[in-house]
Each structure stands twice: as structure tokens, then as C-alpha cells.
Amino acid sequence: MGQSVVVLGAQWGDEGKGKIVDLLTEEIGAVVRFQGGHNAGHTLVINGKKTVLHLIPSGILRDDALCLIGNGVVISPAALIKEISELEDAGVEVRSRLKISPAAPLIMPYHIALDQAREKAAGGKAIGTTGRGIGPAYEDKVARRGIRIADLHYPPQLEELLRTALDYHNFVLTKYLGVEAVDFQKTYDEALAFGEYVQPMKSDVAGILHDLRKQGKRVLFEGAQGALLDIDHGTYPYVTSSNTTVGGALAGTGVGADAIDYVLGIAKAYATRVGGGPFPTELDDEVGQGIRDRGAEYGASTGRPRRCGWMDIVALKRAVAINGISGLCITKLDVLDGMEKLKICIAYEYHGKRTEYAPLDAQGWEECTPVYLEFPGWSENTHGITVWDDLPPAARAYLRALEELAGCPISIVSTGPDRDHTMVLQDPFA
């Protein structure tokens, strides 16, 4: 049987998953996206050249890798076409290697209109979505009024589905949110055109994955966002609209639990978060700004500045537990270079008591005060180091502390944005 590895974020997203996925795909049969949409922004830097992917799996830059988009992903036709075009203009062959589940839901124009109008109406209480229609598309999926890739090839059925959806959503848009209605004919024509475009890429993703496993091929499941943004297990309601945890890899592709051999959790050497929601270790001072500047902590999809803070072991241990993480990858270690002191949150003060467990609701998280352990920093440059013993002693001690406190071994350490700026201590596929 082949080996299957799930790569997912162990924090609030933006952990550097794209680079690690690309690193692990040197001898891969397939890379599959299983949740989220084009709100993800996976940045790859190879030989100094930067590529940002939003929908297409990060394995696309490997010539022999098959790239799959599972049923758990919501697809923006415009975003997919744009991304394919940009890659092909750069000389990357995409369409012959990209396979998309016919069960994948579409992000329609009314989803985008709803998302943006709701965020505007919410004002200061906004969740902080990317405004790209992700949440409303998932809502329609659950409400069984979503339009999927498969529906595009049956025009009468598509027309009926679209009229039903627009009757519902245009009422909300015009009567409740006070914005313009979405035009039926324009939306219908665009959907039909996309159906023709995507037809050659439509495939039974679950069937492909089962066949690859029988053939002994390696498969990598590429998560988007992070475990603490999971719709069920995250800081609800400040979460994304899909299951970003390991269960999403199963439901979002059509494989069983026995198909997963290793779960790799990606975490920065510190912590970041975009948008609203609790963040106990946030540094709203010059230290946080320094981390933001050195780490270039601005969203790949939105350009929004990320909130920065110290590593939160309480949150990380929760991610390890709910995902059954086999090993951790710590990224952006080099961002901490030159800092005199470092802190790791090892517990919370919550209602006058110390706890090592995260609350199950956002309000509870907001009421937590971090309890820190302090560690000496290092003045040496770790950028690009690929050998463990070449790291400064203080950096090694910091990583060993993370490993011990999280109760999970560190498999990979990243010391820069390039594919080669990485040390693999334990190969997830070995």
C-alpha cells in the first residue's frame, strides 16, 4: 500500500504549509486539496522565485505530480481560471494534471455579494472574512441548494437550481442587506461557459485516490487555513466555514481513516492570526511589530497585516490532540533571530485558576491570560541553516522545549522561505 500524509496548519493558518507540501512532493503520486477555497494563500519560493497558489494544490510545480481538488473544496470559477492561466503563462502545465471532483460546490456571484454585504453590515462585529463568498457557498452546500461542478453539464437542471437559489438570495440581498440583485442570465451564461472549460478536468477524485493507494503511490493531503479555525473545533464563531482538521481530509476527498498514515502539523516558531477572534498571546507592541516586519506577516491572499504573538502551547496541544498529529514542522525559526528573550505560553489563568486546557468557546478564550516561560534568545543568524547541529544552542533549546511542552516530536524545521531552507529530522513518508 502507498503512504498517505496529511499536512495541516496547527495554529490559526498562515503557518507555511505550501512550502512544506512542495518540499514533500519530490516523489509524489498526487497532492489533493480537501477543504476551503481561494481564501487560502500558499506561498512557494523556489530558487528565489515566488509563486502564490490559492486553489490549485502546491504540488503543481512538480512536473510528475497529479493535482486533485476534492469535494470538500468550494471553487470560484473566475479564481480557478485566473490561477491556471497565470501558471500556464509561466510555463507550468496544469490542465492535463489537474483533476476536480464533480461534487465540488461552486462559489457563485451571489455568494460573493452576500459575503461582502454581511461583513459591511456587521461593522465592528465582523468575523473578518476575505469577502470571497466562501462561507455562503458552504451554507448553500449544507442547505442543499448549492450548485456543483456536476450540475454544469445539465443545462435544464442548472437553470432550475440557479433560479431557485437566486429567488432566495436576491430577496436577502435587496430586502435585508439593501444591495443590488444578482442577474440570472449573466450568471447562467457564465456557469455554462465554465462548465465547458472545466469538463476535461472533471474526475472521480475518490476513485483516483483509492487506485493510487493500491498502486503503492505516495499521496499528500494539503490542508488550508489552520486547526484552530475549524468550524467545529476552532474559536467559534471566529472560524472558517470548513473542517480544517484531519477529519476534513477524509470527508473532503472520499477516503477512509485507514488511508491516512501520518499527520504533519505545521506551526510557526511564534503565533499569528488574521481577522477577529481571541488570541491570548498577542503582542500589541513594538515586539509584535518587529516580528511582523521580520516575518513579512501580511496575508498572501488579502495583504492584511497579521496579528503576531508568542508561541501558545495550550493552543498547539489542542491542535495536536484533535488531529492526532504524528509530528510537527516548525517554520520561520529565523524570524526570531536577534531577539534577546523569547516567551512560550504554557498555561492560561482563567477565572482565577490556572489551566492547561483551552476553553471551547471564543468568549472563554478572550477571558484567558497567558502564563509564560521565558527563554534566552540568540544573536546568531539561523537563516538557511539545514543541519541541526549548526543551529545556535539557544535555538536548539527553544525547539526542544516546544517539542517537550507540546508532547509531539518535531519532524521538520524551516529556516527561510525557500524550499532548500529546511531541515528534515524525520521524513513523514519514511
Curated annotation (Swiss-Prot):
User: Sorted alphabetically, which HAMAP family does this protein's record hold?
Assistant: Adenylosucc_synth
Q: Which residues bind GTP?
A: 13-19, 41-43, 306, 332-334, 414-416
Q: What is this protein called?
A: Adenylosuccinate synthetase
Residue spans crossing the bilayer: none
What the entry lists under InterPro entries is as follows: Adenylosuccin_syn_GTP-bd, Adenylosuccin_syn_Lys_AS, Adenylosuccinate_synth_dom1, Adenylosuccinate_synth_dom2, Adenylosuccinate_synth_dom3, Adenylosuccinate_synthetase, P-loop_NTPase
List where this protein forms a coiled coil.
none
How does the annotation summarize its subunit structure?
A: Homodimer.
Highest taxon above the source species: Bacteria
> Is the keyword GTP-binding assigned to this protein?
yes
Which residues of this UniProt protein bind substrate? A300, S301, T302, G303, R304, P305, R306
Give the GO terms filed under biological process for this record. 'de novo' AMP biosynthetic process; IMP metabolic process
Binding of Mg(2+), residues: D14, G41
Main location (coarse class): cytoplasm
State the needed cofactors, names only. Answer: Mg(2+)
Functionally, this protein is described as follows: Plays an important role in the de novo pathway of purine nucleotide biosynthesis. Catalyzes the first committed step in the biosynthesis of AMP from IMP.
- SMART domains in the record, alphabetically? Adenylsucc_synt
Against NCBIfam families, the record matches this protein to: PRK01117.1, purA
Q: Where in the cell is it found?
A: Cytoplasm
Q: Name one GO cellular component term.
A: cytoplasm
Q: Which Gene3D superfamilies would you find in this protein's record?
A: Adenylosuccinate Synthetase, subunit A, domain 1, Adenylosuccinate Synthetase, subunit A, domain 2, Adenylosuccinate Synthetase, subunit A, domain 3
Catalytic residue list: D14 (proton acceptor), H42 (proton donor)
